[in-house]
Amino acid sequence: MTDQVLAEQRIGQNTEVTLHFALRLENGDTVDSTFDKAPATFKVGDGNLLPGFEAALFGFKAGDKRTLQILPENAFGQPNPQNVQIIPRSQFQNMDLSEGLLVIFNDAANTELPGVVKAFDDAQVTIDFNHPLAGKTLTFDVEIIDVKAL
């Protein structure tokens, strides 16, 4: 009888990963976390994770705990000035506006487009359609629970 040592499955293509994560901003604010609830499970390459975050996980195995920094270019990108629009105030009748208010618009294909009110006056409203985390360096604390080959 021979002893076989099975290599621990590492994160890579054709794997399913279960992990806990906490997403923090540079100022330390936690944006999202699974540590106080059920862990997240995903298949590598399924598009559910930021590509930069997913790539940073490659090579990790169950039991690994790491802190990863993801630069804006590998996360939500830099803010695009063309995603800031000025809209006539008349399109917001009967709406109580405030800076920071999230407003949902529908495009021609009826897809929801969230935007944040950046400024407003009696004539116009400035809406920022950039992702709220655009331009931010993200920190992920991760604990790998399980890695399975698919």
From Swiss-Prot:
GO function terms (MF aspect): peptidyl-prolyl cis-trans isomerase activity
Cited InterPro entries: PPIase_dom_sf, PPIase_FKBP_dom, SlpA/SlyD-like_ins_sf
Superkingdom of source: Bacteria
Example GO biological process: protein folding
Domain PPIase FKBP-type: 14-88
Annotated EC: 5.2.1.8
Keyword entries, A-Z: Isomerase, Rotamase
Catalysed reaction equations from the record: [protein]-peptidylproline (omega=180) = [protein]-peptidylproline (omega=0)
Pfam families named among the record's database cross-references: FKBP_C
Family listed: Belongs to the FKBP-type PPIase family.
Function: PPIases accelerate the folding of proteins.
Matching PANTHER family: FKBP-TYPE 16 KDA PEPTIDYL-PROLYL CIS-TRANS ISOMERASE, FKBP-TYPE PEPTIDYL-PROLYL CIS-TRANS ISOMERASE SLYD
Designated name of the protein: Probable FKBP-type 16 kDa peptidyl-prolyl cis-trans isomerase
Source taxonomy: Bacteria, Pseudomonadati, Pseudomonadota, Gammaproteobacteria, Pseudomonadales
